[in-house]
Amino acid sequence: MAVGKEILTKIRSVQNTQKITKAMQMVSTSKMRKTQERMSLARPYAEKVRMVMSHLAQTNTDHGIPLLESHREIRRVGFILITSDKGLCGGLNANVLKKFLAQVQEYRNQGIEEEIVCLGSKGLMACQSIGLNVVASAVNLGDTPKMEMLLGPLTELFQRYEKHEIDRIHLVYSGFVNTMRQEPRMEVLLPIGENVIGDSAPKSPFSWEYRYEPTALAVLEYLVRRYLESVVYQALSDNMASEQAARMVAMKAATDNAGNAIKELRLVYNKSRQAAITTELSEIVAGAAAV
């Protein structure tokens, strides 16, 4: 019964793995819900900031703020690449990296260089492995990242845009659609589009005249930074919800596969045990007949 013992050992090993994947599935489900709640709470803030910023930009057209400049000749681009810090989330990071690398290659074909800020260790390791120009990074952000953890890398990139050392900034992340679907997204963060500060931007439902302190221009300059930071944080929350959803689905599939493997191993074990018993009975019968 040496074979039978080996099969039982395999069954116990798969059962232990199944317990781990089941626990990870439950943890990911809980984390996904919490991340979705944070996303919902952050949206109203971002919308209000955008609305006030749009009003100020339209009433102060000669603001002279570099972050609100548009129509630049593209010579150098920046990327904010958001990925997860951990694996076991299916093809989530691979899909984001595929979209990101395709855009990088397209720019390189036009002779345009790139500078990259990586948020998440998976993206950082991928960029370093192929020799891309990573200028700043933030990794090990945890399940509830603070904005302060992102300010250093983001400020580096925004300052380079203000100095005209970068002419466009892309934001790349995995967008959360639903539990079963996450899609890689790439958005132009800078220059800020007409849908944010132009005539097509969302308007306040009130037509009051606002008075700003110390000045409208100072408030606008402050809000532009807060708006950009809120967009990046929203994308990070989106990516984290996608990560937990993808991990939940992957761990459920692993748990189900482990269950199927256990059934197959039990079937093999029962067959081998039955064969061993049949052999023993045959030997007993043969021995009795010989007597």
From Swiss-Prot:
Pfam family, one: ATP-synt
Annotated localization: Cell inner membrane
UniProt keywords, alphabetically: ATP synthesis, Cell inner membrane, Cell membrane, CF(1), Hydrogen ion transport, Ion transport, Membrane, Transport
Gene Ontology MF annotations: ATP binding; proton-transporting ATP synthase activity, rotational mechanism
The keyword Cytoplasm belongs to this UniProt entry's keyword annotation: no
Bilayer topology: Peripheral membrane protein
Family matches, as CDD domains: F1-ATPase_gamma
Signal peptide: none
A biological process term (GO) from this entry: proton motive force-driven plasma membrane ATP synthesis
Main location as per UniProt: membrane
Superkingdom field: Bacteria
Recorded family membership: Belongs to the ATPase gamma chain family.
The protein's name: ATP synthase gamma chain
Organism: Neisseria gonorrhoeae (strain ATCC 700825 / FA 1090)
Species classification: Bacteria, Pseudomonadati, Pseudomonadota, Betaproteobacteria, Neisseriales
